[in-house]
Amino acid sequence: MPIRLYLIWGATTTGKTAQSVALARATGAPVISLDRVQCCHELAVGSGRPLPSELLGTRREYLCDRSVSSGVIPAADANQLLFDKVVRYSAHERALILEGGSVSLINAMIRDARWSALGEWALRRIVLPGRAVFIAQAIKRVRDMLEPPPGHASILDELEGLWAHPGNHAVLEDVDGYRQIIRYARASQVPIDRITSIDRSTMATLVERIAQEYWEHALWQEQEFLGIPATWRRADDA
């Protein structure tokens, strides 16, 4: 019997992780994140990696584990890693949940004919809401990233620690969230190694700018998505 592949996809900040956790609890299937930035464990907060407590006992894994200095994994390499993982899982799992994420990776999958012959697909696309709803969701997410509960790192902590290594700069400047913080720090002449000391007014400005950046990225993801091929075999209840 072919493995069932649940694909949950949609733009950034639309609730994919919550849906994948709910589906994993209902089916017992493991989740593989299709987010290429989440492969960098040092960017856990800024990339939206869920906390262990948020997984509610479900299984979740990432395509690989990379340092920021190695850069974000290219889409073609991510596609190959994912394909190999799915092949291995198909030997002992009845279903897998693929949660994405990276439109570049999903487009690489769409261009790869091998996916048409692997398993049955149950497709769940999350529709991008209107701007007002999206921005409200993004603001909550960004506030949580900037001001997490006590005992948890913030995106500012991540940036401050990583900035000490010049080899990380170009990568950080190319990732949503970190990019806006770096731009603001430079324009305001705030040293990155003191970024965790910003005041409430600056924090509010960063929330607005990062939320807007997420919205623009979400629109780009929607425009770039190629569409699921008709050759992908659908499961009966897809």
Curated annotation (Swiss-Prot):
GO biological process, one term: cytokinin biosynthetic process
Reaction catalyzed: dimethylallyl diphosphate + AMP = N(6)-(dimethylallyl)adenosine 5'-phosphate + diphosphate
SUPFAM superfamilies, sorted: P-loop containing nucleoside triphosphate hydrolases
Pfam families named among the record's database cross-references: IPT
Alphabetic keyword roster: Cytokinin biosynthesis, Transferase
Highest taxon above the source species: Bacteria
Top-tier EC class: transferase
Xref: InterPro entries: P-loop_NTPase, Tzs
An MF annotation (GO) of this entry: AMP dimethylallyltransferase activity
EC number, as in UniProt: 2.5.1.27
Role this protein plays: Transfers dimethylallyl groups to AMP as part of the biosynthesis of cytokinin phytohormones.
Family: Belongs to the isopentenyl transferase family.
Protein name in UniProt: Adenylate dimethylallyltransferase
Gene name of the record: tzs
